[in-house]
């Protein structure tokens, strides 16, 4: 069964400006600019109102799979708005039983070097995605802080660090060493 029209709107805050170029969404805010291309999805994007403070996503004559993309695009745009206003911060903790993992940040926070993982001499180097800065926490021991405006790039960088410390040829129920995401949040606190 096909639904004639499915639509959803996203409210745009005062300090955020959104421009549409076809199906490319550009979000401008206090922390910077994000752009995302939705050309691969067949939907209509439009800005509503005189001040253009609402974004509407329309899908005509869609089946279940196609209708799901409407909410998906809205969620992506909401994440972009949150990114340019508050920013995203992921915290990661080093876990080790015996050999202390030594993490060094190089090149202004764009390269992470992991040494002494399970006592290995090999140095693991993980390059951060563009727009993601990594730093060692001053308040907490063995903690990394990843910050950026794009949630996909921040979470992807965290995944690259976690995957760099996978334990090979051992029972992973016993060898729990690695660097794992401990907390997900925003750089600035939202005013409730």
Swiss-Prot record:
Q: Name one GO biological process term.
A: translation at presynapse
Q: Which residues carry this modification: N6-acetyllysine?
A: 121
GO MF annotations in UniProt: rRNA binding; structural constituent of ribosome
Question: Keywords in UniProt for this one?
Answer: Acetylation, Cytoplasm, Ribonucleoprotein, Ribosomal protein, Tumor antigen
Q: Using the record, list the residue span of the signal peptide; answer none if the entry has no such feature.
A: none
Give its localization: Cytoplasm
Output the PROSITE patterns linked to this UniProt entry. RIBOSOMAL_L6_2
Name the InterPro entries for this protein.
Ribosomal_uL6-like, Ribosomal_uL6-like_a/b-dom_sf, Ribosomal_uL6_a/b-dom, Ribosomal_uL6_CS2
> Where primarily located?
cytoplasm
Q: How does it assemble?
A: Component of the large ribosomal subunit.
Protein name, entry field? Large ribosomal subunit protein uL6
Q: Which gene encodes it?
A: Rpl9
């Amino acid at each position: 069964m096909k639904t004639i029209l499915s639509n959803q709107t996203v409210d745009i805050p005062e300090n955020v400006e959104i421009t549409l170029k076809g199906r490319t969404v550009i979000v401008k805010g206090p922390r910077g600019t994000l752009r995302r291309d939705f050309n691969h999805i067949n939907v209509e994007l439009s800005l509503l109102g005189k001040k253009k403070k609402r974004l509407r996503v329309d899908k005509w004559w869609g089946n279940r799979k196609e209708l799901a993309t409407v909410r998906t695009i809205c969620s992506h745009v909401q994440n972009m708005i949150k990114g340019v206003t508050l920013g995203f911060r992921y915290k990661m903790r080093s876990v080790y039983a015996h050999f202390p993992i030594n993490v060094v940040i190089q090149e202004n926070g764009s390269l992470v070097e992991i040494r002494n993982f399970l006592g290995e001499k090999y140095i693991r180097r993980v390059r951060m995605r563009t727009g993601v800065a990594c730093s060692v926490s001053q308040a907490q021991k063995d903690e990394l802080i990843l910050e950026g405006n794009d949630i996909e790039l921040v979470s992807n960088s965290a995944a690259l660090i976690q995957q760099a410390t996978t334990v090979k040829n051992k029972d992973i129920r016993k060898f729990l060493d690695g660097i794992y995401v401990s907390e997900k949040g925003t750089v600035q606190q939202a005013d409730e």
